[in-house]
Amino acid sequence: MSPAQTQWTSVGPDGGDARAFAAVPGQPQHLYLGTVNSWIYESSDGGTSWRRLSRLSASDDLVIDHIVVDPRNPARIYAAAWVVDHPDGGLWLSLDGGRTWAEVSALHGQSIRSFAIAPENPDLLFAGTLQGVFRSADAGASWTQISPAGSREIHEVESLAIDPADPDTIYAGTWHLPWKTTDGGKTWHNIKKGVIDDSDVFSIIIDPAQPKIVYASACSGIYKSLSAGEAFRRIQGIPSTARRTRILRQDPQHPETVYAGTTEGLYKTTDAGHTFHLMTSDDVIVNDVSIDPADSDHILLATDRGGVLASTDGAKSFAASNTGFSERKVEALIVDANDPHRLYAGVVNDKSYGGAFVSSNGGAGWKQIADGLGGRDVFVLAQAADGTLLAGTNSGIFGLPPDSSSWQPRSTIANTLVKTATETLKGTRVHIEKRVKDQLRQMDGRVFAIDLSGDSWLAATTGGIYTSRDQGATWQGGPVLGVAGYLSVTSHSSLMAAARPDGVVLSKDGGQTWWPMSIPTVLTRIHRVAFSSDGTLWLGAREGVYFTRNNGKTWMWAQRVPIVDIDDLYYDAASNRVLVSSRSSDFVYAMDPATLDWKWWQTGYKLSAVRAAGDRLLAASLYDGVLIEPRAAVAELGRK
């Protein structure tokens, strides 16, 4: 690997979506953690800290919901995965403790929703897929479907459980109802007595000491059977809004204690299901529960948005345990104008766990600064000359002064309208134009870009282009030339430019008036515009990088730079270079605006933006937090 291909380092912010745990048998402090983007993490201290271990495949869309460690050989690990938006996934095998993986060809393309290993025979493996139930008797070397092929009932198998006393007894929960076989899959029968019809069965567990006791969770509630599933009764105590119980987990030391991880918090029963109590806030979405077999007071939760939560007191209290774990979708990234070690990041999809973050040590540690944002997504960050931060969100603009700890709305639209009135002067009717203030209103759509470099501040939003001459206290504007959705803005001296997907407009009077620019006819979608210090306007589009040095009279294509589908284009004034990246690529390109010479780096991650911090580059990734260029990385020169 060349220095330019040295993988960049993810430095946070910690947290994000965590999916599934696996503990090494006999080594409860040694854990693995699956994610929604093909990565697996490892912990050697019981989940106190994590390190990014490996990626199952080059794709970044595998949801890893099941990791199983062979109890005979801890270096042998299985990882089962599926893909969110289409039927795909598979099974991967590692023989070196998770450092490298090979796909199991027999299950290639199978969307594996459940996976289990026989408690008394580790050679027996079971996979529940969208097609049905599959079984391997040789530790995954070969697989056979044991549910009826083409069955209209036993498919979309979300949960599996194997009787610890009899591996031929298998429970399968589908998106419709639970099923059972007692002969290794030769025959199946529905076990729906007591279960509300059309119940998605998310999790099934069997009491290892009393296998006739079976718990099942469904969208209609939690059920318990005392007859090996032949009859169920619904357990009371879980609110109807929290009945999407994704995981059930029994305390190995106290079988009367069962944890239920729901979409509205963690519930716990200590009396075998007679009563349940909420142990977390109801905004916690629980995907998995891990109970330390050596210390059942030590509990880990894999959650959406909040990452890993840890308890050392039997779930009475939880705290984040995400050191080294970062699965954040970072959309905004800026470096403090006066301190290159101070970084700000804006994330999306994490609601109250997201918003904005600050690092004062170059990414080594992060602090959430989201008070006042109300769980909004942050798509853009900008810093004013006085240090005030502006955040463009999915619902307006917010400001954070240097001496404040809470964001305040800065989204007031105060337009002035020109109205024509008819009056009679000295017997003659004349038309008089009057300027009147429009009713104040608030921006309520997404803010795509903010530029604070000129005398007037500039914002691109779903509602159009807005300018402010009072540091964001009020904004003026709206649709420009009859079009509202603008994605990017930039300013240089008295010039302003704004881009929408199919065009660019230019203003020479601080945004009072706009006129359309001529653009190359080959362009089908524009994402970004930026001025360099010499007044050149750069344009990032689906077809590549284009630029004009005469306000659109003529355009040139920077065809030597081998990148298309450009999503971010940024002028780095300190180094006089144009930085370019794409969400469909892990490459970063830097171009000299005068000579058009270019360099490249390969980061190893899909990117949403690239910025400079002193002598190093930073990147906002699509799924893996903020990335930092390693000291060893040396850019490769591009071909001329």
Where are these regions (language model features)?
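An edge-strand/N-cap motif at the start of beta-rich repeat modules
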Residues: 2-40, 51-52, 288-294, 298-312, ...
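Short coil-to-beta transitions that initiate beta-strands within beta-rich domains
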Residues: 11-24, 57-70, 106-120, 147-165, ...
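Short coil/turn segments that connect the beta-strands within blades of beta-propeller domains
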Residues: 28-29, 74-75, 122-123, 167-168, ...
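Short loop/turn segments immediately following the C-termini of beta-strands
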Residues: 36, 82-84, 130, 175, ...
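A short loop-to-beta-strand structural motif that recurs across blades of beta-propeller domains
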Residues: 39-42, 89-93, 132-135, 177-180, ...
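Conserved Ser/Thr-centered positions that define the repeating blades of beta-propeller domains
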Residues: 43-44, 71, 94-95, 119, ...
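Short, solvent-exposed loop/turn segments at conserved positions within beta-propeller repeat blades
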Residues: 83-88, 153, 197, 241, ...
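Blade-level signature of beta-propeller repeat domains, shared across WD40, Kelch, NHL, RCC1
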Residues: 604-640
